[in-house]
Amino acid sequence: MKHFETHRARFERAQAACATRECWSPFPDMPAKYPDSAAAQALGLATFRAHLGGALDKSFVLDQPGGAGEQGEQGEEVSPYTRQKLGIVYPQADPNTLFDAATRAIGSWSGATVDTRIGVLMEVVDRLYQGHLFEITQAVMHTTGQSFNMAYAGSGVNALDRAIETLVYAHQAQHAVAPQARWERQFGSAHIALEKTYRLVPRGVAICFSCASFPTWNAWPSMMASLATGNAVIVKPHPATVLPMAISVRVFRQVLQAAGFDPNLVTLALDSTAEPIGKLLVKHPKTAMVDFTGSVQFGQWVERNAHPALSFTETAGCNTVLLESVDDLDAVLRSLATTLCLFSAQMCTSPQNIYVPVSGVRTPDGLVSFAEVGERLAAAVATLTREPAKAALILAAVQSEQTLALLKHMQAQGAQRGEVLLAPKPYAHPEFAQARTSTPLMLRVSTAERDLYGQERFGPISFVIACNDAADALAQATRDVRDFGGLTAFVYSTDESYIDQAELAYAQAGAQLTINLTGAMPLNFAAAYSDYHVTGLNPAGNAALTHLAFVANRFCVSQSRRPARAKQETEAN
């Protein structure tokens, strides 16, 4: 309970924010606002650099079963900014060793009180923030390609907020179960009195997959959801982005051990792109739950094959934009352009498909043609990415070579089947001359090319799609979400009746809708404690951050009952 009391005020404030859905965070949203920021950033950078091996591989020491590398060491991370290997190798443990250790670790952890577990995990959050935030920021930046600011905010403090938010719901779900009850009723002339005891029983070992582009944002809350409910977690990072999760696992283990619990509640399972072990982990007989964030293909395989384990998935889909009518077209296009560029559209919430009536978009100055809308949007994107210094802040770097190959392929397809409104090209990053970069690709197509845009095209790729009219645009967009998945949606209309139709249609399709938003806030920004991320209603994922359903099925309730004893007897026991 010591840690819970230490963090009680922060936790209770988080509970209040979840109840009201208001804006709150205990963490500064910009690196410069972090306490003693210059010193903290310098220390984080130095710590990150100390991990690097350079020409000679350097072992990341992780004191876990198999930590000496019983199956050797593995590492293949390459910085998207330098295109040089990080030179870090991590111990590869036999999965059976990890499962055995995790299973043994659950006993004392699940026997602790809910508040004790929550307190220890709040201490993990605090330790990550106080001691490792800028180290992880650099690790995220040089494995995913995120900018420094995004790695700090999105993969740092906002991910920590999501972790705390998950703990709030885990606390609520478990405290909803009374630990004991006295039950009495008449059966004929007999009066029956029973003592009932209710126990929270964890499901077992959870596998947590972290993705290549945003490893911590989904993994931290998933880990918290399983651990807070008494389970153990084996983390399976993407081979391209191991370091942020290896640091995280080490911190979890240190805090757990210091609190008197078995650190093997959290371990790291490593694989390579050449020899993946994901399917083996999912189908392992000791796997009770699978948290997966990543590709649509593997996510769908997890959903189909995880049974009898439970699966919690977030993959991707076709995030849609409807342009029906606007008050200020330039403001709308600037906001869209910014969001299309943000982290080179390598986020699961990035918009991709923009549906426009073929007759054009209504504005106070009259109808703007379909062709002009596309051209002005392309021009807005080009303006944002023209200056390398500005492009570096917003586009950052491209995580993988596969994305560049996809850009080339889609550009060729677009030229054959539609029109290339904006061709991609590398830009010169002002700090990292070798950075893997690209400006966005924008294609203009008709709905006849649905096979071209009817899936996530990962990276800075967007489609301006001609629809028969506004009603057809709404029907096409929401059908694509239902069929192919979609996490976010954006509607621009001055017609309240149309907005009402769109709200209902998108709610039924299961995409989180933003209406008529312009200005400084990125359109796809999702606020912890307030915004729900994923609905579970379409193929883009079956779980949501965060509400009770994300945590409540990670534990079960068992009970025992017996004839009521005299008060002194129960007190003696």
Predicted segment positions?
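Conserved C-terminal structural/oligomerization subdomain of aldehyde/semialdehyde dehydrogenase
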Residues: M1-R13, G111-M122, L133, G260-P263, ...
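Rossmann-like NAD(P) dinucleotide-binding subdomain of oxidoreductase/dehydrogenase enzymes
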Residues: Q174-L333, A337
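Short, flexible turn/loop "capping" segments at secondary-structure junctions
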Residues: V78-S79, T313-T315, Q346-T349, L452-F458, ...
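Short, conserved secondary-structure transition motifs
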Residues: A269-L280, V356, A396-L406, P522-A527
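Residue-level signal for inorganic ion chemistry
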Residues: R83, R117, G230, V266, ...
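ALDH superfamily catalytic-core signature
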Residues: K2-A16, F27, K33-P35, V251-G260, ...
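N-terminal Rossmann-like NAD(P)+-binding subdomain of aldehyde/semialdehyde dehydrogenases
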Residues: M1-H191, A225
